[in-house]
């Protein structure tokens, strides 16, 4: 399998490129529009044909490269079926599988950070979007976010996965690249709560600044960055 984790410095976004092997079909998760030319170069270097692009949710801190990649490669665009992005071609449901040749990727509806947030599970690789981060969790104070929904998504879905499941989030701000579900259970400070009410109180008191370009980014991303 080919697996590449790519990092956008400006937004601290992780983008993932997946393929079964060289010369085969590829999929990209959470592309950033400014980096599309780099993705195209990498695809050519690996002799890959991009067939699918997934956004885990409508992002607030960067513009997606989905539409631009579609224009260049004719790939299909994919999001969860709760997305407000009508331009997306394929809307997957909770527990539905996305096929990439011999690879299967399971869609998991994990709202909370936003109302349209999905995570994607491929074997023991979890691409959690902004729902579960390394030593953190996604904020819930905009885009119809909800702390109770986030608690349910994290504690009753993602943390039910095997402890050895690798965690690959859409962001990290401290240089961390990967964790595991087991490690997050033990060490993630936001997961050391005893009830949903305690988690809600914790999230409601974060007092985070609004992303500087949220209105522009969200408007663009509803149109897949076009």
Protein language model features and the residues they cover:
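Active-site HxH/HxHxD metal-binding segment of metal-dependent hydrolases
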Residues: 12, 23, 31-107, 186-194, ...
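Divalent metal-coordination and catalytic microenvironments
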Residues: 18, 30, 57, 69, ...
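Residue-level marker for buried hydrophobic side chains located in beta-strands
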Residues: 27, 52-54, 127-128, 168
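Histidine-centered catalytic micro-motifs
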Residues: 53-63, 108-115, 167-174
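Accessory terminal helices/loops
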Residues: 152-166, 170-226
């Amino acid at each position: 399998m080919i697996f590449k984790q790519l990092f956008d410095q400006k937004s601290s976004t992780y983008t993932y490129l997946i393929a079964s092997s060289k010369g085969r079909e590829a999929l990209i998760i959470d592309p950033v529009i400014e980096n599309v030319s780099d993705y195209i170069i990498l695809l050519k270097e690996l002799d890959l044909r991009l067939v699918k692009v997934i956004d885990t949710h409508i992002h607030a801190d960067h513009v997606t490269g989905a539409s631009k990649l579609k224009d260049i490669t004719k790939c299909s665009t994919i999001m969860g079926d709760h997305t407000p992005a009508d331009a997306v071609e394929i809307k997957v449901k909770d527990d539905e599988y996305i096929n990439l040749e011999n690879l299967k990727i399971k869609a998991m509806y994990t709202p909370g950070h936003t109302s349209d947030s999905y995570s994607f599970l491929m074997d023991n690789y979890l691409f959690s979007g902004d729902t579960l981060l390394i030593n953190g969790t996604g904020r819930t104070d905009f885009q119809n976010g909800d702390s109770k929904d986030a608690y349910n998504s994290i504690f009753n879905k993602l943390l039910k996965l095997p402890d050895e499941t690798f965690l690959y989030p859409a962001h990290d701000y401290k240089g961390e690249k990967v964790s595991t579900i087991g490690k997050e259970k033990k060490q993630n400070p936001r997961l050391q709560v005893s009830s949903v009410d305690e988690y809600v109180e914790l999230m409601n008191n974060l007092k985070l600044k609004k992303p500087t370009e949220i209105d522009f980014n969200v408007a663009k991303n509803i149109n897949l960055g076009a």
